[in-house]
């Protein structure tokens, strides 16, 4: 008998974090992210708190990560501005236990004061971004985010949007697998970002992103479907659902890891289609990077940078 359930995207993120063995969750409420923390608080194995603000939530999660346990911070897009200081520094110092930062963007400005794109912040902070396209991926990608965090020694942003956070889909829950806490090691050069240490860690961060971009060409999180090659679409997140509905016969490169981008995979896909279209809500983050590689593509000349699609 199937144990499938219908879950909100945010509920599925909480489930994925639980299954990944998260022990600490800190958040500041704000639509469309609130239900992540509300749902993870239902699991007795997880310490969950509403923090005074997003910066404190980030610092709680970073502290738990450095102590060796898997941890998560959750907030909406404008909350990431408040949490920027510890996030940027943690990008340099890295993690001990896996650290995932769930950030919910709000295309269409349903409950926010602006329409900023978290991918732009992540690019500046040099932090990788994972973006699911439905509730089941929200569960699975959250688990992958913790694996990537520990493998590459980095915080990982899980980006969602209002439409994904508040829509429901079929989810296939799995058992919780709780890895042993990692031993905390006193490491001044890695954990304390004084100038003498930060200079060396900046080099590490640049090399980390380069390595991750190379590995992304073979990651299960990025998928290619070749159908009619007269049109090829590169897309990610909830926009993938719109592409499937509007262009069911098109070839599609669906990116689960949206920063850093898999250059070799994208170039290979572009070479096999006649016309390349990039479909992404809000800023032309993917489009600008693809065009910087000399690839001809359409994107924001066809679609707006405002609102939902």
Please provide the spans of the model-predicted regions.
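Flexible, low-complexity linker and terminal segments
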Residues: 2-10, 132-309
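Thiamine diphosphate
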Residues: 1-135, 226-227, 285-287, 292-309
């Amino acid at each position: 008998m199937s144990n499938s359930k219908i879950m909100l995207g945010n509920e599925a993120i909480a489930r994925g974090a639980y299954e990944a063995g998260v022990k600490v969750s800190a958040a500041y409420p704000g639509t469309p992210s609130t239900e992540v923390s509300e749902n993870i608080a239902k699991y007795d194995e997880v310490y969950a708190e509403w923090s005074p603000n997003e910066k404190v939530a980030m610092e709680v999660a970073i502290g738990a990560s450095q102590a060796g346990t898997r941890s998560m911070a959750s907030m909406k897009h404008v909350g990431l501005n408040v949490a920027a200081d510890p996030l940027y520094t943690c990008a340099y110092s890295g993690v001990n236990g896996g650290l995932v930062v769930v950030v919910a963007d709000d295309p269409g400005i349903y409950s926010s004061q602006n329409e900023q794109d978290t991918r732009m912040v992540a690019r500046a902070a040099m932090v990788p971004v994972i973006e699911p396209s439905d509730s089941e991926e929200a569960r699975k990608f959250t688990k992958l985010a913790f694996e990537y965090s520990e493998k590459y020694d980095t915080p990982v942003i899980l980006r969602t949007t209002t439409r994904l956070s508040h829509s429901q889909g079929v989810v296939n829950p799995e058992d919780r697998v709780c890895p042993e806490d990692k031993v905390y090691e006193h490491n001044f050069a890695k954990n304390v970002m004084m100038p003498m240490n930060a200079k060396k860690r900046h080099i590490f961060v640049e090399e980390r992103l380069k390595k991750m971009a190379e590995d992304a060409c073979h990651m299960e999180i990025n998928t290619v479907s070749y159908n009619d090659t007269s049109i090829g679409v590169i897309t990610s997140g909830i926009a993938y659902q719109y592409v499937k509905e509007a262009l069911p016969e098109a070839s599609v490169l669906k990116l689960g890891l949206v920063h850093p981008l898999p250059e070799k995979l994208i170039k290979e896909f572009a070479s096999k289609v006649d016309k390349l279209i990039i479909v992404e809500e809000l800023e032309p983050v993917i489009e600008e990077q693809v065009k910087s590689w000399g690839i001809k593509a359409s994107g924001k000349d066809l679609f707006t940078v405002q609102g939902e699609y």
